[in-house]
């Protein structure tokens, strides 16, 4: 029997070869150079894989092989007009089949030439665009890795987002590798912050909500401490917060008493339908905050409790103690990063808690290693699958069979309804939640006879109200 030749499965190597041998490789490279000059001129901010790669280049590392064709993803405070302008520039320079189309991600416009995508421009509200930290690599502005972390945590928080290529299958491994590189080369310094704590008591529903924010940190810390005692590990010396909590419950409610920072005494909960829960709890809605990019959802505030909406999403959760529902550590990390971005005055406090949560995960990992050595593989698997400290696909339930409805799905459904002129039944869950597709950006193809679209309004479309602005409630 003849032996098979050993095959080199270096995917990156063959991708580079394929790119260089494409029939239109020269034209694509020329178009990408035009895009690069446009980014520099407009002072747009690169994000995503290319921003991570360039940030790592500044530290002598990378995630992409040298010479790989750049995939330009960029933030812009005026992404629609910028995308149209870039398309016009490419067309005027003689490139063929130039077009700008709305991407699946509704806040993104894609620019192509010769049916090859050369740029993705995503919307970032001016109040965020003008304040986020950046680095510079070869005259290109790139988003700082501190901000990039948020996008990496996001995939772990909503494992079933982006069907049929759910994040649990398409992003978990890649994003974990990228996060570890960012943590290695751009760690967030630990700067202790002294806080005054006060004991607060809250009564909350048992099944409809997940405990979030500083209270979730307290529950995860004490759960870690109990696991340490079980493993007979000496108490750790740490500068990180060590808040305590207690609770009792009945069939419907939990009474939770927890140490909270005096500066942030409100309890934070995550729930699929905040307005319904607020009504059932008999609370008074005082303020509503719009999303902060993809990193914080709409927030519904009452005097003592703030509700983070998970509407249209399936949030990963942890179960601790006697079936207490807590957000996953990844969502908690995202919360502390969001707090650092959105409230500069307390940035140091939120980053301290961010590092404290990372410390909890690090210590939990060491305890899990001990348990793994002391138990059979089957026993350890069962234990790990119920641990609140590992990545999970356990999600917060909603009131209908399906919970994940991305903006792209709702836009597609709205288009179907508009074309068929048949409204959804009033009993349909999304009957009052379809976007007005007439307010979305239009596709544009220079040289095709139609004028460039004008007067797109960010204010008139709720899908673009993502600057984190809070307004008093009329309720």
UniProtKB/Swiss-Prot annotation:
- Which catalytic reaction applies to this protein? RNA(n) + ATP = RNA(n)-3'-adenine ribonucleotide + diphosphate
Q: Which GO terms describe its molecular function?
A: ATP binding; poly(A) RNA polymerase activity
Give a yes or no for keyword Transferase in this entry: yes
Q: What is its EC number?
A: 2.7.7.19
Enzyme class at the top of the EC tree: transferase
- Pfam families from the UniProt entry: Poly_A_pol_cat (PF19244)
Source organism (scientific name): African swine fever virus (strain Badajoz 1971 Vero-adapted)
Q: Example GO biological process term? A: mRNA processing
Alphabetized CDD domains for the sequence: polyA_pol_Asfar (cd20924)
Q: What does this protein do?
A: Polymerase that creates the 3'-poly(A) tail of mRNA's.
Please give an example of a GO cellular component term from this record.
virion component
Which keywords appear in this protein's UniProt record, sorted alphabetically? ATP-binding, Late protein, mRNA processing, Nucleotide-binding, Transcription, Transferase, Virion
Q: What induces this one?
A: Expressed in the late phase of the viral replicative cycle.
Q: Indicate whether Kinase appears among the record's keywords.
A: no
Q: Which family does it belong to?
A: Belongs to the poxviridae poly(A) polymerase catalytic subunit family. Highly divergent.
Localization (cell): Virion
- The protein here is known as Putative poly(A) polymerase catalytic subunit
Renumbered to this chain, the signal peptide range is: none
Grouped into one coarse class, the protein's main location is virion
Task: Output the superkingdom of the source species.
Answer: Viruses
């Amino acid at each position: 029997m003849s032996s098979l030749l050993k095959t080199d499965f270096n995917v990156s190597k063959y991708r580079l070869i394929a790119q260089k041998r494409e029939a239109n490789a020269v034209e694509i490279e020329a178009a990408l150079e035009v895009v690069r000059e446009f980014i520099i001129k407009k002072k747009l901010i690169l994000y995503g894989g290319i921003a991570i790669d360039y940030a790592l280049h500044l530290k002598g590392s990378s995630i992409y092989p040298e010479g790989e064709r750049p995939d330009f993803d960029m933030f812009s405070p005026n992404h629609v007009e910028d995308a149209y302008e870039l398309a016009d520039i490419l067309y005027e320079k003689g490139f063929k089949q130039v077009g700008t189309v709305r991407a699946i991600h509704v806040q993104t416009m894609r620019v192509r030439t010769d049916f090859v995508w050369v740029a993705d421009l995503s919307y970032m509200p001016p109040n965020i665009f003008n304040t986020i930290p950046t680095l510079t690599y070869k005259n290109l502005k790139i988003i700082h890795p501190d901000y990039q972390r948020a996008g990496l945590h996001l995939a772990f928080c909503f494992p079933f987002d982006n069907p049929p290529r759910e994040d649990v299958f398409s992003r978990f491994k890649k994003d974990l590798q990228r996060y570890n590189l960012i943590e290695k080369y751009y760690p967030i310094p630990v700067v202790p912050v002294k806080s005054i704590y006060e004991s607060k008591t809250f009564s909350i529903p048992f099944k409809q909500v997940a405990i979030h924010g500083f209270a979730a940190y307290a529950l995860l810390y004490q759960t870690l401490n109990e696991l340490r005692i079980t493993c007979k590990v000496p108490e750790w010396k740490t500068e990180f917060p060590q808040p305590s909590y207690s609770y009792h419950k009945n069939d419907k409610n939990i009474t939770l008493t927890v140490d909270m920072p005096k500066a942030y005494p409100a309890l934070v909960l995550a729930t699929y339908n905040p307005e319904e829960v607020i009504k059932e709890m008999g609370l008074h809605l005082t303020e509503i905050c719009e999303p902060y990019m993809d990193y914080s959802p709409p927030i519904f505030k009452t005097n003592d409790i703030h509700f983070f909406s998970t509407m249209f999403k399936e949030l990963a959760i942890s179960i601790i103690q006697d079936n207490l529902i807590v957000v996953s550590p990844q969502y908690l990390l995202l919360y502390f990063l969001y707090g650092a971005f959105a409230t500069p005055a307390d940035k140091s406090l939120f980053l301290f808690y961010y590092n404290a949560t990372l410390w909890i995960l690090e210590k939990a990992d060491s305890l899990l290693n001990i348990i793994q050595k002391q138990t059979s593989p089957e026993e350890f698997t069962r234990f790990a699958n119920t641990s609140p400290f590992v990545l999970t696909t356990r999600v917060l339930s909603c009131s209908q069979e399906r919970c994940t409805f991305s903006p792209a799905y709702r836009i597609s459904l709205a288009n179907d309804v508009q074309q068929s002129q048949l409204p959804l039944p009033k009993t349909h869950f999304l009957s009052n939640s379809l976007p007005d597709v007439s307010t979305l950006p239009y596709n544009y193809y220079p040289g095709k006879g139609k004028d460039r679209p004008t007067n797109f309004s960010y204010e008139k479309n709720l899908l673009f109200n993502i600057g984190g602005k809070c307004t008093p409630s009329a309720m």
